[in-house]
Amino acid sequence: MKNQTISRIFQRVLSLRIRWKLLIIAVAAFLVFLIFKGPPPGQNHFVYLADAFLHGNLGVSGGGMGLAEIVPFNGSYFVVYPPMPAVLLLPFVALFGTGFDQGLMSILLSCLCVSATWLMLKKIGANRSKALWLAALFGFGTCFWFISSVGSSWYIEHVVAVLFLTLAIIFALAKKSPLLIGVLLGFAFLSRLPVILSFPFFLLLIYEQNSTWKPRFKQATYFLVGLGILVGVYELYNFGRWGSFSDLGYSLIPGIQQDPYFTNGIFSLNYIPRHIYAILFQGPILLSDFPYFEPNWMGLGLLFTTPAFIYIFKGPWSRLSKYAALAVVCILPILITHGTVGLTQFGYRFSLDFTPFLLILTAKGMRENLGWEEKALIILSLLVNLWGVVSIIQFNFVSF
């Protein structure tokens, strides 16, 4: 495989016309995100972590400044979450200090996610209209809209992971640089650990895109090396914090052993029923007076949040669809055995770890020229999420 610089790879993937379309989509998405943006989040761990990195430290100063889930260890205070959002915040914190609004970073990255989603849909063969409708579905018809608008630390992790996962899928579909694809998936992993379990999707694409075993093995090796480098970086990061390569630090969160959501440990098969309920059946809270129903901080079922996802099940089941479904199946077990379902949230935010693959399945299930049924469900999805964003952020109509 010829050595390719990243700039050349991007130039080959993106024509000038495509770049302009991506810019227009990003600007339009940014304006919508900005209009509905929430106040600066109080839980802005990654701003302080970026500040720590800039000062040559892994631990944050000031005893954690009242941030949740800060881990005191050997006289220092550590952010337990993977560090990629803090890495992206470095230039902003360097310029503006710890007063920088992490929520602003969230919507800046979110508009890039919408553009990247449009490009991913084009790569799987969607026409211009269909790609735009489904990019809008992703940005504003899933729980991505709410988490983007809030931008707290638990939410911005999803934004960063979605961005890099979608970019990895784009380059995999374009048959470009498996080393870079591995690095991009590694960046997503450094924001949300479960997304690494989607790696079979990329290996299967490499297998399909090459007709003999020698290039298959070579490109798979490049991919795994790229991914492995970032896994190694995370292990070194863990060693720098806890003195252990494999300790993720979550068991060190003060009080987690006594938390009623974790009575069987951080992960347990006993937690599966609560996730199944959250994914399939969780509804809004019904009230006897205005506004008569309101979002539940426990979440909202996936098909209630995004009715258009019903097309996931329609098929046809091409090889790409099967690979995408496999990615979902690989990621899901670690999510549904976790003690919490992702609260507080609108929708089921853990689904964002595999939403790019759900969009592939949805696109394949819809007609190439969208009919009124598909458009109606997309519009309904947009309205549901508009209700969630406005109810919670603007009016605080939400409870358990």
What residue spans do the PLM features occupy?
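Membrane-proximal envelope and lipid/glycan-remodeling enzymes
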Residues: 1-400
